[in-house]
Amino acid sequence: MIQIGDVVVSLDVFQEKFLCDLGACKGACCIEGDAGAPVELDEVMELEEVLPIIWDELAPEARAVIEEQGVVYTDEEGDLVTSIVNNKDCVFTCYDEKGCCYCAIEKAYRDGKTDFYKPVSCHLYPIRIGDYGPYKAVNYHRWDVCKAAVLLGKKENVAVYQFLKEPLIRKFGEKWYQELEVAVKELKAHDMI
């Protein structure tokens, strides 16, 4: 692990390869698992504000869940997460004509309808952020549904941190990411990665 400011980064983030292959996985990370995506407290209001913009895109089951419990809930581990439908799909998940799932929030962002991209934890996946007092931990999360992304990352030689440059900058800032790149060069120079 290396430390940049108050952020500790696992070496896996530099060593492992990853490049989403949506055509292969069809967005499984949005529909698999036992809880919704982690949400930061300040994102709840943004989720609620974008709701009227994306409401008609959402499945009837998702709208029913949102009407009953809201856009987020506290999971078994005590974390705030996006609401889910039938213990599976994120409520913001939609499907295209090919059966590929996509995020209704991200689609609205790309269509210029909102400034909110999507929860940062979704944007950062397969990185997960842990809070440890004054420190944050950046870890690479391995999941079987992302096997195609690992293969594509190896083929294209794209490390996790490179694939996630934009969301890492969103979370920690441009200066932090530049320091991360300097650290990578140092680690490579000393054959540590």
Sequence positions of predicted segments:
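Short loop/turn segments that flank or connect secondary-structure elements
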Residues: M1-I193
